[in-house]
A protein has these predicted regions:
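The conserved acidic donor/metal-binding loop of glycosyltransferases
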Residues: 253-258, 493-497
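Short acidic/polar active-site loop segments enriched in Thr and Asp
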Residues: 151-152, 275, 429-430, 487, ...
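Short, acidic, metal-binding catalytic loop of nucleotide-sugar glycosyltransferases
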Residues: 143-152, 421-430
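Cell-envelope/extracellular polymer assembly enzymes that use nucleotide-activated donors
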Residues: 125, 403-404
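Catalytic-site signature of metal-activated, phosphate-bearing donor transferases
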Residues: 2-50, 54-113, 204-220, 224-228, ...
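Low-complexity, Pro/Ser/Thr- and charge-rich linker/hinge segments at domain boundaries
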Residues: 113-131
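Active-site beta-to-alpha loop of glycosyltransferases that engages the nucleotide-sugar donor
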Residues: 128-143, 158-163, 407-418, 437
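Active-site-proximal specificity loops/subdomain of glycosyltransferases
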Residues: 162-247, 441-488, 500
């Protein structure tokens, strides 16, 4: 009984299809289907024969020519690979309704479809895929391109299961007739799924290039019926089966709208010298959808201010571009687009992807309104989208004013006074210091300094907030009066020294050198231990002058930067390396420069934290980063743990990455006199001097205890070994994977190589980074 019902259903669909074709203009939607036959290990998507007797077989994988044996009178003329699929071309001497092939060892009788379809001859055609968009969206899409570009027909690959095709076709038919559209649709379904086998449904945010946190986002289960299109051979099938005699074909998707300002895209292609026009698309987004509503074209009023992504498509006039070897998603092979400017199109992302929460599709901090999209929503779609909230007014930038450093500390007692003195001399007025779990007197010294007006000290509330110490501190800092009233803000650690190399070395000199800037990236210069193994109670900046070269692309930490920024309201909160939460409506007010005063690209405005060959600069300011200091002090640092990446050990691999002794930089010594004057003032206070001495004594005592511990003694021996000293001068010769895996992967003969030589060493990648 089930077979009878299935057969009757199939016959009804066939009759429905025939009646539509024979019914002429009364019907606007024709249904068609790709056979998608499986033969052995191969899948034959379609077989098409044209009026010259050329037969095309379209396989959804790489197929060797010898795997397909044609019948007598049918001769293979070419076997072409296209995007992982195969097109075989045969000449048929005596056309027949059925042809017997042997494919992958199995006999198969083919009844090829005649193509291209005559009802599309000399028509302006849209070529698109539908993957979940509802009929209302497709109707709006058809109406737009019919009205503004003169579209007469559309061939739409419907990615839904075949059983869903009739109801969708009926909805389209009813909508076209209701709207009075003079446009005809060929709706193509397939007997087999055509998506990527290992991807979720395309609606899943995982399939959106801009989706934030994709490295943490768990993709939905594979859904080969609704996944992004994997059978990209479809475009060549569409050409041979339907469109090779069309006047012009525009290849977009049903959530794309082609810019109408330059006239009809079809006319442009038809008069183009090459017969092809390049289409270049951007992604557009809603700001938010009204509760309980489905997304529409008119909801999409936002673009990303910093996006550089371009979607490539095309419009071709087949009669003029006869030299084309094949059609693909993003190009027509062997046809150059016209030299005039490409035509733009907008891809409306919430129509194909789940738009219930726009923040899952795109970082909302990147979205700004596009006035043209707002106008189009009202004028063309008569829609009232939810607009972006009005931006807060920016505070004026002050050339000087109060500059504040926010930092976190744990057992840093011996190094506090020099760091404080240096930055006071540079021009920082306020210091907000959070401490936690100190055992060396750091917290006592900080509390004393607060009582005497040098800084503001707070206990780190990381336990109550259930955050990492540094993140808890920065989140709490937003509510502190000294932060709220600050004109300039910087998050820096006690092993980081702002080294201003212009003018008199003060913040005023830096601001004078780049008067329009309101954000400064200060790139790290990693300073090593200069082969100094023992702790000495003396300024760090006078002891350690060996460092990484200015051009140091590896390890990736080497070119990290910290950010000094004007507290104007451009950003919402502090961050470890740079402020976070850019107010995107104000992105054009951001004047971000590097350490040489050169403008930074907008691509870093939201989340960039490290320099590159195009953006590094040290001429005006750099951040001296003394991450290791002496080997003895590093023992204490390792035991203490980290305030940000608390789950990562500061072991031999960390020392290897951060201990850089290949170059020398003494530029900060020009500022020693200013630092020393403030340090003397601090040490002239007996209570401060006593608290500092206590911290130094505890630091030395802890070093003695750790060196007596067998594990730490062995670690110290490794740190101070001739091998590790040699490696600290060879970083420029190593590939990135060496730093990820640690010094143990470097053979002894490589460690003994000449630092000045022109050699290179790397290792294969691994999944786990060594710390």
């Amino acid at each position: 009984m089930a077979r009878v019902i299935a057969r009757m259903s199939a016959l009804w669909q066939l009759w429905h299809h025939i009646m539509k074709i024979e019914g002429g203009s009364h019907y606007h939607v024709l249904q068609d289907r790709l056979p998608c036959q499986t033969i052995g290990s191969l899948q034959l998507l379609d077989a098409v024969i044209d009026d010259s007797g050329t037969l095309f077989l379209f396989f959804n994988s790489a197929v060797a020519a010898e795997a397909v044996q044609p019948p007598q009178g049918v001769h293979l003329t070419s076997c072409q690979r296209i995007t992982g699929a195969t097109v075989m071309r045969f000449e048929v001497s005596s056309p027949a309704k059925a042809l017997s092939f042997v494919i992958d060892g199995s006999s198969l009788t083919l009844a090829p479809t005649s193509g291209p379809k005559t009802h599309l001859t000399d028509r302006n055609c849209l070529l698109a895929t539908r993957n979940g968009e509802n009929a209302a969206v497709v109707l709006d899409w058809l109406a737009f391109h019919h009205r503004h570009h003169g579209a007469q027909s559309a061939v739409i690959l419907d990615r839904a299961r075949p059983v869903e095709a009739p109801s969708f076709a009926d909805a389209l038919e009813a909508g076209i007739q209701k709207r009075g559209l003079d446009i005809h649709i060929t709706l193509v379904s397939a007997n087999a799924p055509l998506g990527h086998a290992d991807l979720p449904a395309e609606a899943d945010p995982f399939c959106v290039p801009e989706a934030p946190g994709k490295d943490r986002h768990m993709a939905g289960p594979p859904d080969v019926w609704r996944a992004p299109l994997g059978a990209n051979i479809w475009y060549e099938i569409a050409r041979r089966r339907f469109l090779d005699k069309a006047r012009a074909v525009a290849n977009i998707d049903v959530h794309d709208l082609i810019d109408p300002s330059g006239g009809s895209v079809f006319d442009r292609a038809a008069i183009s010298p090459t017969g092809m026009i390049a289409l270049r698309g951007r992604h557009v987004f809603p700001w938010r959808l009204r509760r309980g509503t489905k997304p529409q074209f008119g909801d999409h009023i936002c673009v990303q201010f910093d996006s550089t992504q371009i979607r490539k498509r095309w419009c071709v006039a087949p009669g003029k571009a006869r030299q084309a070897t094949d059609w693909r998603m993003v190009k027509v092979s062997d046809v150059a687009p016209a030299k005039d400017h490409p035509i733009g199109f907008d891809r409306h992302m919430a129509l194909r992807h789940d738009g219930s929460n726009i923040a899952r599709l795109v970082p909302k901090a990147s979205l700004i309104e596009d006035p043209a999209l707002v106008a189009r929503a009202a004028d063309l779609f008569e829609h009232d989208p939810i607009r972006l909230p009005a931006p807060a007014t920016l505070s004026p930038k002050r050339h000087g004013g109060r500059s504040v450093i926010v930092t976190t500390m744990k057992n840093e007692g011996p190094f506090i006074l020099e760091w404080l003195a240096h930055h006071r001399a540079v021009g920082f007025k306020d210091f907000l210091v959070y401490s936690n779990d100190c055992t060396d007197g750091t917290d006592v010294l900080l509390q004393l300094l607060m009582e005497k007006g040098w800084l503001v000290h707070r206990d780190n509330p990381y336990r109550q907030m259930k955050l990492r110490p540094q993140h808890a501190a920065l989140q709490s800092a937003d509510d502190e009066p000294c932060v709220r009233r600050a004109d300039w803000l910087l998050c820096a650690d006690v092993d980081e020294f702002v080294n201003i190399k212009t003018g008199d070395g003060t913040l005023t000199a830096l601001f004078d050198a780049a008067p329009d800037a309101n954000v400064f990236s200060m790139t790290w210069r990693l300073f090593g231990n200069a082969d100094r193994h023992h702790f000495v109670d003396a300024p760090v900046t006078t002891q350690f002058h060996r460092c990484a070269p200015e051009v140091t692309r590896k390890p990736h930490q080497a070119w990290g930067f910290k950010t000094l920024f004007a507290n104007q309201g451009l950003f919402r909160k502090l961050g470890v390396h740079r402020p976070k939460g850019l107010n995107p409506q104000h992105w054009e007010s951001v004047k971000w420069v590097n350490g040489s005063g050169a403008p930074m690209p907008r691509s870093i405005y939201r989340n960039g934290w490290r320099s590159s060959m195009a953006t590094y600069g040290y001429d005006l300011v750099q951040l001296n980063h003394y991450a290791v200091r002496s080997a003895e002090s590093f023992l204490v640092k390792r035991e203490r743990g980290r305030v940000n990446h608390v789950d990562r050990d500061q072991g031999l691999s960390y020392w290897f990455r951060m201990n850089n002794n290949a170059d020398e930089d003494r530029s900060i010594l020009a500022r020693i006199s200013g630092m020393q004057a403030v340090l003397d003032q601090l040490m002239d206070d007996p209570e401060i001097a006593q608290a500092h001495a206590f911290c130094v004594d505890r630091h030395r005592s802890r070093i003695v205890q750790l060196r007596a511990n067998p594990t730490y003694a062995a670690f110290y021996a490794q740190l101070t070994s001739p091998r590790m000293q040699a490696l600290s001068r060879l970083h420029g010769h190593f590939g990135a994977n060496v730093f990820l895996q640690g010094p143990g992967v470097v053979p002894d003969d490589i460690a003994a190589c000449d630092p000045q030589g022109t050699w290179f060493f790397t290792v294969p990648p691994v999944d786990e980074t060594s710390h």
